[in-house]
């Protein structure tokens, strides 16, 4: 079978297939080698690129650090130049001295004229002033004498000082308000410094034992004299605020009303009885003209006092208001000057004198006439406001037109 043609063909075919396979394998191997070489070259190129970028970044960072260092050096140099003050020239020093001298002269002038000083100036003067003796007034007088005899203290005429110190001599006797002899009187600056020192110590200085001066009447008068002598303003003057509650105030008003009603009920109505008896008897009218004059004068004085200080009338019901009392008839019959004056002004005196000042109804409630008057006043105010607004609007429009025409 070895020499058969079929076997030879098969062997040749196998050889050709193996050669083709070997060629294909070789081609595949070469292709793999080329692919591997290409990948290696790409990796090398990428590494070179990364290295180049790294180097560029390092150079950039170094440049930034160098610029920051230079900027810091420049800022330090500029700040050092600004902090270090250059030496003053002769002209600048002379100008500064002239300004200071001018300020000092102005302060002295203001002190002579007695102008008020600021709070900071007073505090500075008090801090620089000598210590004040708290137990006696001798140390205070000595310090005032030293400050008055110093060459820097301004000289004041004796006339002004005596006129300024005159109200202090009449006021209370305190450590700051007590006056030294004529040779030891100090200026206004020493008085202000002593008063501020007294305020800082809390007012602990004792009053001088002077037998000639009378004892102080009260703490309020002493404090008032002290502030008047030193030119300071006292805070919280006048009566204190009423700290009572609304209930306490109402209770006090009720007590006053009850007391007034009790007093009116206890007093007999002798005036009306005597007046009626006097009017009914004509013989008594002719026999006692002097008593009539005295009664008229006393009645006029009582009526005038009633105008200034009206009394509370007892509470009466509204159904009895139409009844005319004897007092009203008496007041209508007897001519009164004050009533005539009230009539001149278009008012009826009895309506105001007999008003109950403690009545809640009269004081707290408004009548229809009061409401109408308030409405009329509000309408007039609104109308006036509308007219003013319309006038302003017209003026604005005219101004706008003028601007457009220009």
Curated annotation (Swiss-Prot):
One of its GO terms (molecular function) is DNA binding. Residues 125-141, 159-178, 259-279, 287-307 have a biased composition (Polar residues). InterPro entries: Chromatin_SPT2. GO terms for biological process: nucleosome assembly; transcription by RNA polymerase I; transcription elongation-coupled chromatin remodeling. It is found in: Nucleus. Residues 38-188, 202-330, 383-406 are annotated as: Disordered. It comes from the Eukaryota. Residues 19-111, 370-406 form a coiled coil. Keywords: Activator, Coiled coil, DNA-binding, Nucleus, Repressor, Transcription, Transcription regulation. GO terms for cellular component: heterochromatin; mitotic spindle; nucleolus; nucleus. Residues 340-406 are annotated as: Important for interaction with histones. Residues 38-74, 91-114, 383-398 have a biased composition (Basic and acidic residues). It holds the Pfam family SPT2. SMART domains: SPT2 (SM00784). Interacts with tetramers formed by histone H3 and H4. The acidic C-terminal domain mediates interaction with histone H3/H4 complexes. PANTHER family: PROTEIN SPT2 HOMOLOG (PTHR22691:SF8), YEAST SPT2-RELATED (PTHR22691). Belongs to the SPT2 family. Histone chaperone that stabilizes pre-existing histone tetramers and regulates replication-independent histone exchange on chromatin. Required for normal chromatin refolding in the coding region of transcribed genes, and for the suppression of spurious transcription. Global regulatory protein that plays positive as well as negative regulatory roles in transcription. This is Protein spt2. It comes from Schizosaccharomyces pombe (strain 972 / ATCC 24843) (Fission yeast). The lineage of its organism: Eukaryota, Fungi, Dikarya, Ascomycota, Taphrinomycotina.
